[in-house]
Swiss-Prot record:
InterPro entries: ATPase_NBD, Carb_kinase_FGGY, Carb_kinase_FGGY_CS, FGGY_C, FGGY_N, Glycerol_kin. GO terms for molecular function: ATP binding; glycerol kinase activity. It is an enzyme of class 2 (transferase). Sn-glycerol 3-phosphate binds at T13, R83, E84, Y134, D241. Keywords: ATP-binding, Glycerol metabolism, Kinase, Nucleotide-binding, Transferase. Glycerol binds at R83, E84, Y134, D241, Q242. Signal peptide: none annotated. ATP binds at T13, T14, S15, T263, G306, Q310, G407. This is Glycerol kinase 2. One of its GO terms (cellular component) is cytosol.
């Protein structure tokens, strides 16, 4: 078993981070550098790949400095990343030919509307995804269609495509390795998750040459070596951030579920070695530990959770800092009958209504901002239940424990209400850096830094467990009222347009 430490590279939507772990999965040092978002037109969201790379290198140096280690002490590197974000670069010079098109970018909606209308079933059956600008496929097509000479260069093999993990590994290996893992490939809308290969029919449909795509490898594997830090270090782990978080929550068994509470919420359920195709949820690859053998997941995305707290802070100016919401909400015993539906941009799973709009209902003369604060926190828990109920139904598996992470999971009031409204235990781990920890685990397994999943399970520790404290009748009464509130928000924008 090698000694030393594992370096986890965690490249997010607004910052590049690096975290150093030891064999007990303790965090020894964290580096973080923000980089700007670029909005050249309405609906466009871009990053400059050079800014990402520079921020990432600074974050690595900062983490190593804080951990008081040198590059020769790094046993392996894992890379986790914001998913779907798309970069095309020149295969010879390594220079990006355009900015990275970010997962939030909506410019390709005309392409995906056409796919939805004509090829919805085929794409869902092959990729587990629904045609949406969110995924990489339509972004690649847009660059090939809109930049002069790029398509002809791509057809000659002079262009490379990658999600952020692929680009960083390419840069770390000085252009020697062009690779991604199963989890990231499954977010492109180009990867057949049944056959575990790039899908030629979809590639032909979008006119994307297969030669630009990376090799797809297991999430725990030695892809190559980097020398940019001063020593030769294996790059041995790669996974998209939400899948890495599921792995970091040691959710290795079928039916285990985690929810990440961020700006939105991502709920993933391990569904084992056979995909389940759902009407309301995405089917995705969680990870692959061996070639041609993967673990699948069901994924539900909630658009607005933590963002509702930001709106309460910045839009209403009701609090000075996001952390102020918990004590304010705790100053009242309940919401006083107030329900808040945060449909600022429509509703995601399981409603899928882009015309829904936000509402606050149940206000009386006695309602205070504390009641609204509490209703905002409770709306996060209700939305999680909406998705978890669908997961149970479509997987045929009863969920008994919800593992939680992300900024919102630090809020004890919210986590207690989450347990109350689900009627199950909610478990928060000691180390909340679950995405970076997950990819550190994947990197360590590939180089025998750790020997087994069982060993990793032993090292994972719980910070706090939340047990349901209300009875079933009360739980269902509140949840039914939530569903009634949601019903009143549905189709609002459309109903205005018809008048």
């Amino acid at each position: 078993m090698p000694g030393g430490f594992i370096l986890a590279i965690d490249e997010g939507t607004t910052s590049a981070r690096a975290i150093i772990y030891n064999q007990d999965l303790e965090v020894l040092g964290i580096g973080q550098y923000d980089f700007p978002q670029h909005y050249p037109s309405p609906g466009y969201v871009e990053h400059n790949p050079d800014e990402i790379w520079n921020a990432q290198m600074l974050a690595i140096k900062e983490a190593m400095k804080k951990a008081k280690i040198e590059s020769r002490q790094v046993a392996g590197i894992g890379v986790t990343n914001q998913r779907e974000t798309t970069i095309l670069w020149d295969a010879i010079s390594g220079k990006p030919i355009y900015n990275a098109i970010v997962w939030q970018d909506r410019r390709t909606s005309n392409i995906t509307d056409w796919l939805k209308e004509n090829y919805f079933g085929m794409i869902k059956d092959k990729t587990g995804l629904i045609p949406d600008p969110y995924f990489s496929g339509s972004k690649i097509k847009w660059i090939l269609d809109n930049l002069p000479n790029v398509r002809s260069k791509a057809e000659k093999g002079e262009i490379k495509f990658g999600t952020i993990d692929t680009y960083l590994i390419w840069k770390l290996t000085n252009g020697k390795i062009h690779v991604t893992d199963y989890s990231n490939a499954s977010r492109t809308m180009l990867f057949n998750i049944n056959k575990l290969e790039w899908d030629r029919e979809i590639l032909e449909l979008l006119k994307i040459p297969e030669s630009i795509l990376p090799e797809v490898r297991p999430s725990s594997d030695i892809y190559g070596y980097t020398e940019v830090l001063g020593s030769s270090i294996p790059i041995s782990g790669d996974a998209g951030d939400q899948q890495a978080a599921l792995f970091g929550q040691v959710a290795y068994d079928m039916g285990e579920v985690k929810s990440t509470y961020g700006t939105g919420s991502f709920i993933l359920m391990n569904i084992g070695s056979n995909p389940i195709f759902s009407e309301n949820l995405l089917t995705t690859i969680a990870w692959g530990l061996e070639s041609k053998r993967v673990t699948y997941a069901l994924e539900g995305s909630i658009f607005i959770t933590g963002a509702a707290v930001q709106w309460f802070r910045d839009g209403l100016r009701a609090i000075d800092a996001s952390d102020d919401i918990e004590p304010l909400a705790a100053s009242v015993p309940d919401t006083g009958g107030v329900y808040f539906v945060p449909a600022f941009v429509g509703l995601g799973a399981p409603y899928w209504d882009p015309y829904a709009r936000g509402l606050i209902i149940g206000i009386t003369r006695g309602t205070t901002k504390a009641h609204i604060a509490r209703a905002i926190l409770e709306s996060i828990a209700y939305q999680n239940r909406d998705v978890i109920e669908i997961m149970e139904k479509e997987s045929g598996t009863k969920i008994n424990i919800l593992k939680v992470d992300g900024g919102g999971a630090k809020d004890n009031l919210l986590m207690q209400f989450q347990a109350d409204i689900l009627g199950i235990r909610v478990v928060r781990p000691k180390v909340m850096e679950t995405a970076s920890m997950g990819v550190a685990m994947l990197a360590g397994l590939a180089i025998n830094y750790w020997n087994s999943l069982n060993e990793l399970k032993q090292k994972w520790t719980v910070d706090k467990e939340f047990i349901p404290s209300i009875n079933k009748e009360e739980r269902e009464r509140r949840y039914n009222a939530w569903k009634e509130a949601v019903k009143r928000s549905l189709g609002w924008e459309k109903s205005l347009g018809s008048k």
